[in-house]
């Protein structure tokens, strides 16, 4: 088992395809297939369930994927630790859609100017999925809105560290004409969605959620006169509010940066300083 074999395994797991993994890595398909077979022989388990032209992870493969990501992350951290004054390598960052749209553009520009040797990648997902990504080492860090725990403090998994970085005013956008409403929101796992559903449940008996993929789609739903949505003021200020809609502050929310406790990669340290 070596570094390149783990990279191959992760790519096949993420794409569920030997063909796509080969394209990403610039390798021959036969080489990808052989390396996966060798890895399975070494581990004495089947990592994939082969069928229907897809390479789907087996239960053992799902478990091993988390370890593979952590091994590569630790190897990268060790490499960077040898050159602590010159951040390099990669930084895999996750963020909520709102944060990526309204907060990150100038910060990413500044970070690349200060750390040109760092290869930074960004993905956008809801808070729950981002938290899982950091826990499994698929991400180095993520900007999320942690839900409150029983004590009112952010409910952060014990394996993670966090710090507050942004404070958002969440705006409720709804039609001017009163009446029963549905709620337009991102997929389950979004903290803002949970807050919006709670508000709507206080207003009416039934709560029906329509899932969308963008804030523009949310506003389009509200403009139809049958939906409400919740979005940060920082995002709403970048958009045009439909004429037949009104907006009002509903609550405050905090955006936190989360990362695995003990992770001390120079690139991550520089990103934390920037925030």
What does each model-found stretch correspond to?
Residues 10-28:
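Short helix-boundary/capping micro-motifs
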Residues 39-40, 111:
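Conserved amphipathic alpha-helical core elements
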Residues 40-57:
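A short LG(V/I)-centered, amphipathic sequence patch enriched
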Residues 88-151:
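Central regulatory/effector-binding core of bacterial HTH transcription factors
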Residues 125-181, 234-241:
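Acidic, Gly/Pro-rich loop/turn segments at junctions of secondary structure
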Residues 177-179, 244-275:
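A late-sequence structural motif
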Residues 181-204:
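Secondary-structure junction motif
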């Amino acid at each position: 088992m070596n570094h390149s074999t783990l990279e191959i395994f992760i790519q096949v797991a993420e794409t569920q395809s030997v063909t796509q993994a080969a394209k990403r890595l610039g390798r021959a398909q036969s080489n990808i297939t052989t390396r996966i077979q060798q890895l399975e022989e070494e581990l004495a388990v089947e990592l994939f369930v082969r069928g229907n032209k897809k390479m789907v992870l087996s239960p053992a493969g799902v478990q091993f994927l988390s370890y593979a990501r952590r091994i590569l992350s630790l190897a990268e951290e060790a490499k960077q630790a040898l050159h602590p004054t010159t951040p390099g390598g990669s930084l895999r960052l996750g963020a909520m859609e709102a944060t990526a749209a309204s907060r990150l553009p100038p910060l990413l520009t500044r970070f690349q100017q200060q750390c040109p040797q760092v290869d930074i990648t960004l993905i956008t997902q809801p808070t729950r999925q981002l938290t899982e990504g950091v826990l499994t080492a698929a991400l180095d860090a993520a900007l999320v809105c942690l839900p409150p725990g029983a004590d009112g403090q952010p409910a952060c998994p014990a394996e993670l560290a966090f710090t507050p970085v942004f404070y958002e005013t969440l705006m409720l956008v709804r039609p001017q004409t009163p009446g029963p409403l549905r709620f337009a929101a991102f997929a389950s796992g979004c903290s803002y969605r949970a807050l919006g559903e709670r508000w709507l449940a206080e207003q009416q008996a039934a709560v029906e959620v329509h899932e969308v993929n963008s804030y523009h789609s949310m506003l389009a739903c509200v403009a139809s006169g049958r939906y409400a949505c919740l979005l940060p003021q920082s995002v709403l200020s970048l958009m045009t509010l439909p004429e037949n809609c009104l907006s009002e502050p509903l609550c405050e929310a905090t955006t936190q940066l989360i990362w695995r406790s003990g992770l001390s990669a120079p690139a991550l340290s520089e990103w934390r300083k920037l925030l």
